Regions:
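Active-site beta->alpha loop and helix N-cap motifs at the rims of alpha/beta catalytic domains
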Residues: 10-12, 35, 42-48, 52-102
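Alpha-helix-loop-beta-strand connector modules within alpha/beta enzyme cores
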Residues: 34-61, 100-122, 155-180, 211-224
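Catalytic cores of alpha/beta
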Residues: 11-18, 65-77, 124-139, 163-167, ...
Length: 224
């Protein structure tokens, strides 16, 4: 099973590599669900990581309906990062009517080809998810990160299983949101090939935003 770690700190990247994770989603501002990281952070991450890094492109907190200036900002951020050696990008945009932003996903695919592309948890807010899966497959996206329309993926696992069945191995459905060492095996047993988690210990006070080495290692071991 592929284990993707959401990393917002250098220690998280180090721990993900040491613990045997397969890929990193690099972002900043974990507390608001992740935003586009700085160029400096991307460069430092690439210099120390031996596993692939996909960079989140999200210009602000809040919803995923973006105006023209925000769309342009995301494209410019992609252009400034794509030649640094990243594996791919994590993106998403929704139209005001709840449909997937076809123009944006097609533009990003053309801009980044042949880099790896993930459509992020904006997917959970789409009005027609099966139609969106078809469009993402056609656009050449590799995977969809989602939680099955619930806050936690374990709560949405029934919906996730339905989406996974519909995708028919043409695109990866990657559960994310509340995935942890206690429930990770449920996703493997349900037939998912990849999972996404932060590995942050939520019971720490104050919360330390480093992905925990032992947590990642246990998830890797359980899902072999």
């Amino acid at each position: 099973m592929i284990i993707e770690i959401c990393a917002t700190t250098i220690n998280s990247i180090i721990n993900a590599n040491r613990a045997g994770a397969n890929r990193i989603e690099l972002c900043s501002n974990y507390s608001v669900g992740g935003l586009t990281p700085s160029i400096e952070y991307v460069k430092e991450a690439l210099s120390i990581s031996e596993i692939p890094i996909n960079v989140l492109i999200r210009p602000r907190p809040g919803n995923f309906v973006y105006n023209d200036n925000e769309i342009d900002k995301m494209k410019k951020d992609i252009i400034s990062i794509m030649d640094l050696g990243v594996n791919g990008f994590v993106v998403g945009s929704i139209k005001s009517n709840g449909e997937i932003d076809d123009e944006f996903i097609n533009d990003v695919r053309a801009l980044t080809n042949p880099l790896d592309l993930t459509f992020h948890r904006a997917f959970d807010y789409l009005s027609s998810q099966t139609r969106s899966i078809d469009k993402l497959i056609k656009s050449g996206f590799s995977r969809i990160l989602c939680s099955g329309n619930e806050n936690d993926a374990i709560e949405g696992i029934t919906n996730l299983i339905s989406l996974n069945r519909y995708s028919n191995n043409k695109i990866v459905i990657m559960p994310g949101g509340g995935v942890n060492k206690e429930n990770c095996l449920e996703f493997k047993n349900a037939g998912f090939k990849e999972i996404h988690l932060s590995g942050i210990l939520k019971n720490n006070s104050p919360i330390i935003l480093d992905s925990d080495y032992n947590t990642i290692k246990e998830v890797v071991y359980k899902t072999k």
